[in-house]
Curated annotation (Swiss-Prot):
Subcellular location: Secreted
Family matches, as InterPro entries: Aurein_antimicrobial_peptide (IPR013157)
GO biological process: defense response
Pfam family, one: Antimicrobial20
Name used for this protein in its record: Citropin-1.1.4
Keywords noted in UniProt: Amphibian defense peptide, Secreted
Organismal lineage: Eukaryota, Metazoa, Chordata, Craniata, Vertebrata
Assigned GO CC terms: extracellular region
Tissue distribution: Expressed by the dorsal and submental skin glands.
Length: 18
């Protein structure tokens, strides 16, 4: 669902920001 996509994007952003 859309929320799953949002969580996936958030995870990628989290990894990239570290």
């Amino acid at each position: 669902g859309l929320f799953d996509v949002i969580k996936k994007v958030a995870s990628v952003i989290g990894l990239a920001s570290q």
